A protein has these predicted regions:
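Long, histidine/aromatic-enriched segments associated with O2/redox biology
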Residues: 1-276, 281-283
Length: 284
C-alpha cells in the first residue's frame, strides 16, 4: 500500500491463522519476500548481498532460510517433494492470475510457511506407518491405492476438487536445517492464482476433512511462520515509475537457489530464503 496505493490485488490479505487442538498455523507479519533460486549458492549470496546493500536502510530482515536440494528432490522426512506439480501450460494456469483480476494479470499469490520436524519421533515410525501418513511409497514415490490410503493422508487432504476437477498449485518447497542444532525442516512455498486453494488445503490439514480427521504429519511437524504475498508480473514491475522509496518502509528479504523450472524433477535448490519486514508499524 505504501509503494503502490490502490487498487490492490483482489485476494491479497493477511495470512489467516488456524488453530485446532494442539495444531496451529501461525500468521507472521511481513511485507516483502525475495525467493531466489540458482544452481550456485555463491550467486544467491551475491544477489541478496546487493539487494540488502540497496534497501538495507529501509528494511528489517525477520527471517532468512537457506535451502538446498536433498538427494532426488526429497524432503528431510525422506519422501520426494513436489511429485504432483503441474508442468508447462498447466503450471501457468495453476499459478497465474488472469482475467479475474485484469490489473494484476500475470501475477501470482504465494504462501510461505516454515515447518520444523521432530525427526526423533518421526524416525521411530516404521516405513509403512510413514507411508500411510504421507499417502505414497517412500522409496518408489508411488501413490498408495485408494484402498490402502487413509483419508487423513497428507496427499488426500491437500487434494482440492472443484466442479469435479482437481485444482493444482505450484510448489517449490525447500528442505533446510542445522544438524548441529537439531534443526530439520521444510520451507513450504506454494504459488497459486488464488490463495483460497492453499487456504483450503491448510484448513483440511489443521482442522480436518471432516473436522477431526486432520493431517497426521502435523503430529511431527510444526509451523513457525505463515505469510501470504502477491507476486507482481515482470510487466507490472517494468511499468512502475522509479523514484525514492518511502523511508518508513520495512522489507522482507529471502534467498533460495533456483533453476528456471520449479518442477520437481528438474529444479535445483541450494540457496537461501530470507524474509524481512517494513520498519513502520501499522501498515499493510
Amino acid at each position: 500500500d505504501k509503494l503502490f496505493g490502490k487498487p490492490r490485488p483482489a485476494e491479497l490479505h493477511t495470512f489467516r491463522e488456524i488453530r485446532s487442538g494442539e495444531r496451529h498455523a501461525v500468521s507472521t507479519p511481513a511485507d516483502v519476500l525475495f525467493h531466489i533460486r540458482s544452481k550456485r549458492m555463491d550467486m544467491c549470496f551475491e544477489l541478496v548481498t546487493q539487494i540488502m546493500e540497496r534497501i538495507g536502510g529501509a528494511v528489517s530482515a525477520v527471517d532468512e532460510t537457506h535451502g538446498f536440494r536433498y538427494f532426488d528432490d526429497r524432503d528431510l522426512l525422506g519422501f520426494v517433494d513436489g511429485t504432483e506439480n503441474p508442468r508447462g501450460e498447466a503450471a501457468l494456469n495453476a499459478a497465474l492470475v488472469t482475467e479475474e483480476d485484469p490489473q494484476f494479470a500475470g501475477g501470482s499469490y504465494v504462501i510461505v510457511q516454515k515447518y520444523l520436524h521432530d525427526m526423533n519421533e518421526w524416525n521411530v515410525l516404521s516405513t509403512e506407518e510413514q507411508e500411510r501418513i504421507m499417502g505414497r511409497k517412500k522409496l518408489s514415490d508411488i501413490e498408495l491405492s485408494d484402498a490402502a490410503k487413509p483419508s487423513s493422508a497428507h496427499n488426500a487432504l491437500t487434494t482440492i476438487v472443484e466442479n469435479g476437477k482437481e485444482v493444482k498449485i505450484l510448489r517449490d518447497n525447500m528442505p533446510f536445517g542445522k544438524p548441529g542444532h537439531g534443526e530439520f525442516g521444510t520451507y513450504f512455498i506454494g504459488y497459486s492464482r488464488s490463495p483460497r486453494t492453499i487456504e483450503q488445503m491448510l484448513e483440511n490439514m489443521f482442522i480436518g476433512r471432516p473436522p477431526g480427521n486432520y493431517d497426521r504429519l502435523l503430529d511431527f511437524s510444526r509451523a513457525v511462520t505463515g505469510t501470504l504475498f502477491f507476486v507482481p508480473s515482470a510487466t507490472f514491475l517494468d511499468n512502475v515509475v522509479s523514484g525514492s522509496p518511502s523511508p518508513s518502509l520495512q522489507v522482507e528479504t529471502a534467498k533460495a537457489p533456483a533453476t528456471d523450472d520449479p518442477s520437481p524433477r528438474q529444479r535445483s535448490r541450494g540457496g537461501s530464503l530470507g524474509i524481512g519486514s517494513l520498519k513502520e508499524v501499522g501498515h499493510e
